[in-house]
Amino acid sequence: MPKYRSATTTYGRNMAGARALWRATGMTDSDFGKPIIAVVNSFTQFVPGHVHLRDLGKLVAEQIEASGGVAKEFNTIAVDDGIAMGHGGMLYSLPSRELIADSVEYMVNAHCADAMVCISNCDKITPGMLMASLRLNIPVIFVSGGPMEAGKTKLSDKIIKLDLVDAMIQGADPKVSDDQSNQVERSACPTCGSCSGMFTANSMNCLTEALGLSQPGNGSLLATHADRKQLFLNAGKRIVELTKRYYEQNDESALPRNIASKAAFENAMTLDIAMGGSTNTVLHLLAAAQEAEIDFTMSDIDKLSRKVPQLCKVAPSTQKYHMEDVHRAGGVLGILGELDRAGLLNRNVKNVLGLTLPQTLEQYDITVTQDEAVKKMFRAGPAGIRTTQAFSQDCRWDSLDDDRAAGCIRSLEYAYSKDGGLAVLYGNFAENGCIVKTAGVDDSILKFTGPAKVYESQDEAVEAILGGKVVEGDVVVIRYEGPKGGPGMQEMLYPTSFLKSMGLGKACALITDGRFSGGTSGLSIGHVSPEAASGGTIALIEDGDTIAIDIPNRSIQLQLSEAEIAARREAQEARGDKAWTPKNRQRQVSFALRAYASLATSADKGAVRDKSKLGG
């Protein structure tokens, strides 16, 4: 039977010094011998998705203490991708994921904590904590801050829903007046919480449900709604039960690697494809799988993408539905219920509540449950009041959206598309694959061929787009923006948003070894692997080269002969130390980012560190 890890610091005369320090934190004799549970918070005033988390760690800690544990809280960093977007700050976003994972490992192992409750929310915080949880493999429950309410404003005598991306597009559109742009900006992000569409943060918080590491409702219940408080209270109680099950009953089913099994990863990716989630989730699931020592690769994602339909369509793919609408339609369990009925899920998985997938669906799928409390929870809706406070309102929809023919969530029979919302493409300059969010691609451009316009930085591409140098039919190629080449694999939300602003959203393609925001839509193909800085063929593309994209056939091709590609590769290698680097880019890269780049792998490996360079 495993011994409490914390006993290392609380048991025996030789640990008198450690106990003396524990006493200085408020512990007493009666606390020694209880499980010490880390409350891993990520409160910051920089990020709307985290601005309301300050008191929520205390809420969880109180429940841990009341349930027989000792709670000790610490904080991680949290980068707001939207605020870091479009300038040098975005270089730091993806690397912050590794810092978060490492900092959790450092704190938990340094102090020998027995278990964790992870209070996350936004883009890199949930993945970083997920990576740490699977690396450490001690009992854990995730409870996120919850989604932001959708913005609303009146334009042309019509009330429309808004989010961050609308503010960006309108702000860059020369046809939009200053007054209208300002109106949209002021209305787009009305409350605390993760941005209101199916962007990266909300996608990842939904996926923790599918992995089994968070409670039903975690991914969709609004940050402002009073019902969300119960998730935090339950997490504090439940983590003590999980911890005692493992340490006192030798029940390894309580460990995250046994909950988030390969079958659970496949379910999570199936959910992601069905709901048209962010392409960043591919990056993060691949990284998390490596921490869990699970053989889950781009090949697995490709296989799933070929058979899973799109059953949910949410902003940025449509402005009709946001996360508050997904919740009204049954949230993650609503989508999983339809996938289960279609025979597309692994049913032999459990979650942190100890329930199998069929048991969870029986209780929480709104189309079958008889539990009125569950139905009431899924009627939790927005209040439309600007606030930075969690649990500040208790408004409810008059009814649930259980229309699986024409509602937000569809059944297999009425799927938005028989093809899923994400696809993996392969070709002669993406030998290890690349990713496109098909949910955001107009049907008219699922096949697209055009001349390349090549840029060696996001900034250069933005200048060209706004300067009118990109025209209808072009394929914009942005390279040397991968994990190593950026470094940091910047998100390309500004280039894609500005293409829309210039009326080119359905007339151009954009390809990059960087990545895209969860807010991106259009023919935007990212994660090209291998990246340019790692010798990828994307580094050999020249202006005017023809690129052919065929999403239905999962193909992307540079239309050059093998001999010409080989000749260009030879010329690139002849540059010596300058080979596989941008020719003209001027970019200041800090020592910290250079250290990250020195170990970074390409996107097909999740952009994790290359363990072979560390003897791992």
Swiss-Prot record:
Belongs to the IlvD/Edd family. This is Dihydroxy-acid dehydratase. One of its GO terms (molecular function) is dihydroxy-acid dehydratase activity. HAMAP family: IlvD. Homodimer. [2Fe-2S] cluster binds at C122, C195. Functions in the biosynthesis of branched-chain amino acids. Catalyzes the dehydration of (2R,3R)-2,3-dihydroxy-3-methylpentanoate (2,3-dihydroxy-3-methylvalerate) into 2-oxo-3-methylpentanoate (2-oxo-3-methylvalerate) and of (2R)-2,3-dihydroxy-3-methylbutanoate (2,3-dihydroxyisovalerate) into 2-oxo-3-methylbutanoate (2-oxoisovalerate), the penultimate precursor to L-isoleucine and L-valine, respectively. The modification N6-carboxylysine is found at K124. GO terms for biological process: isoleucine biosynthetic process; L-valine biosynthetic process. One of its GO terms (cellular component) is cytosol. InterPro entries: Dihydro-acid_dehy_C, DihydroxyA_deHydtase, DiOHA_6PGluconate_deHydtase_CS, ILV_EDD_C, ILV_EDD_N, IlvD/EDD_N. It comes from Salmonella paratyphi B (strain ATCC BAA-1250 / SPB7). It is an enzyme of class 4 (lyase).
